[in-house]
Amino acid sequence: MSALKNSLDPVQMLCLDGDGIGPEITAATRRVLQAVDDCFDLNLTFTTQDIGFVSLAASGTTFPDKVLDAAKAADGIVMGPVSTIDYPPASEGGVNPSGFLRKKLDLYANIRPAKSYEGLPPRVGNKVDLVIARENTEGFYSDRSMFFGRAEFMP
């Protein structure tokens, strides 16, 4: 991803809808980001590229090269969930978008907040307010959809 420029330049956000509920999640995220932009004049601009099953049907791969080019040019990426467990083998176009982006853009942290909100009772146990930081400085995450390859597997 590109480095942020001066505050007057547009901030290029790339939206990757993903599979299943991904389009719904990225649309909601985009609305939130637009509301933040309206309040703080961040000058966000949004573009969308297809990944996942939509891309597989259109181009023969779940992550086309043009998406990587767009990701490298973007200042930020919003990516919805993907159904990697259901993808065909890589030899048939089933590339794991999140793993591919992580490797190609040298990303090493996955931040996952979890918080209980008033009016929504917790399903199990007590309320929570935590952030899980999953780092990847040793070179790989275990990938549940990979059964062979570069030491990234879960039997």
What are these regions (language model features)?
Residues S2-G20, D38, L44-T45, F53-P155:
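Anion-binding alpha/beta catalytic cores of soluble intermediary-metabolism enzymes, centered on
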Residues I21, I25:
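Conserved phosphate/anionic-ligand binding catalytic regions in large, soluble enzymes, centered on
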Residues T26-D37:
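Short, polar/charged alpha-helical segment
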Residues Q49:
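The conserved SAM/SAH-binding core of class I Rossmann-like methyltransferase domains
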